[in-house]
């Protein structure tokens, strides 16, 4: 009798994001609307508003007034699936990422000429996917998934002088996951179902330095630490109709998985060309090579509770990932049209961490190019309203998956997305 292989979607909970979401690897970029307008070039050196709490906490030293910055970024993703084949029937509609909204909020208060204090609430990771139930590659992909990671970051900065400042903030990160995937075995012609829920709180930090190298050149370096999670929750298994209960039957188990989100470093430069023009450039390194594999541990599995096949099929589930480190590069510019208006644009190039051997419908990502435009309007000295638009286009990539049940799926994926953002900064 063939061994039942249960390919759960808890790996998505660990990876924590859909690659259609303007991601560097799987990390969301939407933490600043003003930064979105320049393609996040100069993320560590711009310090234009309170969102510098995330971009570079040392940048708080440049903000001379108490202020709050908030915003909302929305993402409308599209996926085309072509040349699909497999030994199971099904559909390949694509467009599995629903319309998504990502909020953010920051606060900065200068204490004196040297010290500043700030707070940030933002989403560093996220997921929202929804394949159709009849998806042909359902044994290698989540049917539905929602991951929420919310970070709270209290922050302080210190200016040694008018040239050099540093900043530091611990991060408190809460992740919750709810995922659903298909379970198809030779024991039944009908699909079963696996639903996984879990949550955890992880801790890290964000540290940065900002240097005014010349009167017109500013350099920033920011380091975001790794964060360790231990997702704990439960797995619910519902075999397809007709599956012999003595072999595999519906049950609920305690589940856990250890995961470490990667550290990243961003180096940015802001260059004042004249009174109107600014040039931004940046590079971000992310240590995605931490993600070698994903191992899910399900506890309390016995043959009497789950069927004869349950202990060998469900107790430990391991999926190879073998990701590699990535670099993202960005260049952007802004033009101060007048006292009220600033115009922005940027271009970004972002590597994918996946490889051709292990890539699956769960994370069918390729290298991407992102074009961005934006604007800021300041009707008064106290208020600035920012808007931004980004268009993302990925290279075509192929997935080619098979498992020990003899099931297979291959297809060509092409992803794109439109991102819109609106935010405001109020100074008081």
Residues covered by each model-derived region:
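Surface-exposed strand-loop-strand hairpins of Gram-negative outer-membrane beta-barrel proteins
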Residues: 40-48, 77-98
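Outer-membrane beta-barrel porins/channels
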Residues: 24-39, 86-92, 99-428
């Amino acid at each position: 009798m063939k061994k039942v292989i249960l390919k759960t979607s808890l790996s998505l909970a660990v990876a924590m994001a859909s690659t259609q979401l303007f991601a560097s690897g799987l990390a969301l970029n939407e933490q600043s609307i003003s930064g979105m307008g320049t393609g996040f070039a100069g993320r560590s050196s711009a310090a234009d508003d309170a969102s510098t709490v995330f971009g570079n906490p040392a940048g708080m030293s440049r903000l001379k007034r108490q202020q709050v910055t908030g915003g909302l970024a929305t993402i409308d993703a599209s996926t085309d699936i072509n040349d699909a084949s497999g030994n199971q029937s099904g559909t390949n509609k694509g467009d599995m990422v629903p319309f998504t909204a990502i909020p953010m909020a920051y606060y900065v208060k200068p204490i004196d000429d040297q010290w500043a204090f700030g707070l940030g609430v933002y989403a560093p990771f996220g997921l929202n996917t929804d394949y159709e139930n009849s998806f042909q590659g359902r044994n290698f992909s989540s049917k539905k998934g929602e991951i929420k990671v919310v970070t709270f970051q209290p922050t302080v900065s210190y200016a040694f002088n008018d040239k050099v400042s540093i900043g530091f903030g611990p991060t408190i990160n809460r992740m919750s996951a709810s995922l659903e995937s298909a379970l198809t075995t030779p024991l039944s012609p009908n699909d079963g179902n696996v639903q996984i829920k879990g949550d955890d709180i992880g801790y890290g930090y964000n540290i940065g330095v900002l240097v005014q190298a010349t009167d017109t050149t500013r350099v920033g370096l920011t380091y975001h630490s790794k964060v360790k999670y231990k997702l704990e929750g439960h797995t619910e298994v519902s075999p397809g109709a007709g599956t012999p209960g003595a072999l595999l039957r519906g049950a609920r188990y305690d589940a856990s998985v250890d995961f470490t989100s990667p550290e990243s470093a961003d180096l940015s430069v802001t260059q004042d060309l004249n009174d109107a023009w600014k040039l931004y450039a940046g590079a971000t390194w992310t240590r995605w090579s931490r993600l070698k594999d994903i191992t899910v541990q399900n506890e309390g599995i016995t043959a009497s509770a789950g069927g004869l096949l349950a202990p060998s099929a469900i107790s430990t589930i391991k999926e190879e990932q073998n990701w590699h480190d990535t670099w993202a590069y960005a260049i952007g510019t802004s033009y101060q049209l007048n006292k009220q208006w600033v115009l922005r644009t940027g271009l970004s190039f972002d590597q994918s961490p996946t490889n051709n051997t292990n890539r699956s419908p769960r994370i069918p990502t390729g290298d991407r190019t992102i074009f961005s435009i934006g604007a800021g309007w300041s009707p008064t000295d106290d208020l600035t309203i920012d808007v931004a638009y980004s268009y993302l286009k990925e290279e075509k990539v192929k997935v080619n998956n098979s498992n020990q049940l003899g099931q297979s799926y291959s297809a060509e994926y092409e992803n794109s997305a439109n991102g819109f953002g609106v935010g405001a900064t109020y100074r008081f």
